[in-house]
Design a protein with these regions (language model features):
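Short, Lys/Arg-enriched N-terminal segments with co-localized hydrophobic residues
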Residues: 1-27
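Non-catalytic helical/linker scaffolds that mediate oligomerization, partner binding
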Residues: 19-507
């Protein structure tokens, strides 16, 4: 009898050992890993282990946790990053215009099919009779609709629990449990196909964003983006705080976001394919098509895209991923995703370190053996039109030359990160090593596919820039003496010079 469990475990063990060997041999994973920080991994020791296992970006989810607790977590994170000597970005994930249940006296309650359960404007502690709403005005909105609200379905906890509106009074929405289950504190409420008229950046979001940016976040994930105006509203607020350099990732997770995806991609710095709420708001059979479409469009415009939600969900309680999860992660890599994300697996699971290692191994294997011709052709045909034709021409030439000479890396001098991003837009076969002159730029490149950023010093001449770039590349371990590399640089003695020099060198 063929034991699938034994063979799956052997497969994962083998691929992890193989990846470790490849890493020592100088092969770099190009797909980045985002990990949500939570109770299972918020100590300095655990976060250091996650960095060593392959975490590139730490996600702080503002839907959970309080400021005092988060301050300690971020302090631990910064210490772990400093000790590791690696570049790890901090991503702040906003609540957005979401609706959640409040808290329960015992942390959770079991809802039985057919039982009555109410959603209150105000209720100190939830119990089997009902729970408070994070957006109390929803009661007023439903009451104003009268009979139109009766029979409406509410999906809780990503659709695990279903309620149907029975009646509405000034203080609560009275529901019948259509599909029961265990409902825990602060779980989401989705109303498929229903637009809730809420301000995009709430007062709580403003406080959360200011808190996160003051504590070192360099990217903000905007939840439940409905259209590009939401991105503009958030951009204006962040700029008003003096954080113009902070980047915005728009989370597309509802039908209105899908409908306006082209404009949202244009206005945002990156996109997250947030499959959890999307799978509740939109028929789940549409998810694969939407995921592939979003990834293609984002990559072709030279931006980064994160594929998120339930990537390795079973590893919340199990030490090995399922075969379906392995295929899901690999297919996201084949689609061209810039990054993959862990949520509960790292934040609240039993095996956060093993989850990171599994992602690291699966992504590396998929990158090495995947077929990316269709993606490259799409990017060539539909790719962005760079406002700097010299930069785009040199980057495109660098990719072709690197492929022709079998270069082990493309080394770029990138003071702002723009050249490195322009370079990976063309998806070269070899990694891109970006030599930056600020830690901020290094952190901002943490989400970009195929880029390893290292700190360098400000140099003036092409020769000194090239020499430093080659030395820094050697220090990464990605390349070694005798390897062929392609080097992009500029001459700082010329005030109008951009990246204008391309060299093929042997280290």
């Amino acid at each position: 009898v063929f034991d699938w469990k034994i063979h799956t475990d052997l497969f994962i063990c083998t691929i992890m050992e193989y990846k470790h060997f490849k890493k020592d041999g100088g092969i770099m994973r190009k797909t980045k890993i985002v990990c949500t920080i939570g109770p299972a991994c918020d100590s300095k020791e655990m976060m250091r282990k996650m960095i060593d296992a392959g975490m590139n970006v730490a996600r702080i989810n503002m839907s959970h946790g309080v400021y005092d607790q988060l301050e300690v977590t971020i302090k631990n994170l910064k210490e772990a990053i400093a000790e590791s000597g690696q570049n790890v970005a901090i991503l702040l994930d906003t609540k957005g215009p979401e609706v959640r249940v409040g808290t329960f006296k015992d942390g959770s309650v079991e809802l039985s099919e057919g039982a009555e359960f109410s959603l209150f404007k105000n209720k100190e502690e939830g119990d089997e009779t009902g729970v408070s709403l994070s957006f109390p005005k929803l009661v007023d909105i439903f009451e104003s609709e009268g009979q139109k609200a009766i029979g409406r379905e509410l999906l809780l906890d990503d659709g695990i629990i279903s309620l149907v509106v029975k009646s509405v009074n000034p203080e609560s929405i009275v529901c019948t449990v259509n599909k029961g289950g265990v409902l825990k504190n602060r779980k989401s409420i989705n109303i498929p196909g229903y637009f809730i008229n809420m301000p995009y950046v709430s007062a709580q979001d403003r406080k959360d964003i200011e808190f996160g940016l003051n504590h070192g976040a360099t990217v903000v994930a905007a939840s439940f983006v409905r259209n590009h105006d939401d991105v503009r509203t958030l951009r204006d607020f962040i700029d008003s705080l003096g954080y113009e350099y902070v980047e915005i990732i728009a989370k597309i997770e509802n039908q209105s976001g899908v409908d306006d995806m082209d404009a949202i991609i244009d206005y945002a710095d990156g996109i997250m394919v947030a499959r959890g709420d999307m799978g509740v708001e939109i028929p789940f059979i549409k998810l694969p098509e939407i995921q592939k479409t979003i990834i293609r469009k984002v990559v072709s415009r030279g931006k980064y895209v994160i594929t998120a939600t339930q990537m390795l969900e079973s590893m919340t309680t199990a030490p090995r991923p399922t075969r379906a999860e392995i295929s899901d992660v690999a297919n996201a890599v084949y689609d061209g995703t810039s990054a993959v994300m862990l949520s509960a697996e790292s934040a609240a699971g039993k095996y956060p370190i093993e989850s990171v290692k599994a992602l690291d191994a699966i992504c590396s294997e998929a990158e090495e053996n995947g077929e990316f011709t269709a993606l490259h052709e799409y990017v060539e045909e539909h790719g962005m039109k760079d406002t700097n034709p010299i930069r785009s021409s040199i980057c495109k030439a660098a990719k072709n030359i690197a492929q022709a000479v079998g270069a082990k890396a493309i080394i770029v001098e990138s003071a702002t990160g723009r050249v490195a991003r322009a370079m990976v837009h063309y998806r070269p076969d070899c990694p891109v090593i970006a030599v930056a002159t600020s830690q901020l730029v290094c952190r901002k490149l943490c989400l970009n596919w195929g880029v390893m950023a290292v700190m360098g010093e400000e140099k003036r001449t092409s020769d000194s820039i090239t020499k430093q770039a080659m030395e820094k590349a050697l220090s990464t371990g990605v390349v070694k003496k005798g390897d062929t590399v392609v080097v992009l640089s500029s001459n700082k003695t010329c005030p109008t010079s951009s990246t204008d020099s391309l060299n093929v060198r042997i280290l």
